[in-house]
């Protein structure tokens, strides 16, 4: 056995070099990348401020900090007072300027323009300040033929008076009904001679006017003009046409009955209309005709009725 001991080679131990270790660590680690910013979001610093060039904000001195806008009222009121004082006298002279002309406008059928001018001249003073416009309007509208009045001042010295007359639709008692169904009393009733005559209770005036307009529209296309319409206390209707033919309608279904009459008129009555004196449409499924006495249609009807009666009498009877 060899007495020689095993020889262990020397091992060189070196102290760790911090630079080398740092280099090794750096080579193995992946570089850190900044977080990706989504579109639409601004990059901010940890303090919450935007990145970029910042300019220091320098507070500007406020030279108007002492100013209070309410102070403007003082010089404004002073200016208005001074201006009003100097303008009062010229304005007063302008307002007191006397009229040089009065213009009367409107369509005149029942009241003459001369009559309107006369009513106006009685109310006009020498200047605008003393003119009572409301009293002038009342004076004009008190005339039953005047519906409305409009007054306008046309500077510097002209008064424009616009007058709208009443529009009579039908006669009613000692006056007429206007387009609103109002009863207007007038003295010159003869000036309404060409209008239809409506009769009934005053409380039913609007309804009667509406019924007249509906019936007139239905009959006018066939040359049948309504000259009178009456509604009695039982609300029974009766009308008179231009050739003095009276039609008894009754209390209910007025338009339905008259439409049935129009149908019969178109098919049977049109050709013998001059021989008809009266018609009764109060039946549920027809109408009755009263002929003018002695007319050809009346004679023909009487002959036909007599023949029918004789045929009935001579007909054989069966046991």
UniProtKB/Swiss-Prot annotation:
Topological region Cytoplasmic: 1-70
Native species: Cellvibrio japonicus (strain Ueda107) (Pseudomonas fluorescens subsp. cellulosa)
A cellular component term, taken from the record's GO annotations: plasma membrane
Biased composition, class Basic and acidic residues, residue ranges: 27-52
Boundaries of every POTRA domain copy: 97-166
Pfam families: FtsQ_DivIB_C, POTRA_1
Location(s), subcellular: Cell inner membrane
Quaternary structure annotation from Swiss-Prot or TrEMBL: Part of a complex composed of FtsB, FtsL and FtsQ.
Sequence ranges on the Periplasmic membrane side: 88-319
Purpose of the protein: Essential cell division protein. May link together the upstream cell division proteins, which are predominantly cytoplasmic, with the downstream cell division proteins, which are predominantly periplasmic. May control correct divisome assembly.
Keyword match Ion transport: no
InterPro entries in UniProt: Cell_div_FtsQ/DivIB_C (IPR005548), FtsQ (IPR026579), FtsQ_C_sf (IPR045335), POTRA (IPR034746), POTRA_FtsQ_type (IPR013685)
Residue intervals passing through the bilayer: 71-87
Lineage: Bacteria, Pseudomonadati, Pseudomonadota, Gammaproteobacteria, Cellvibrionales
Gene that specifies this protein: ftsQ
Family (UniProt): Belongs to the FtsQ/DivIB family. FtsQ subfamily.
PROSITE patterns in alphabetical order: POTRA
Identification of the protein by name: Cell division protein FtsQ
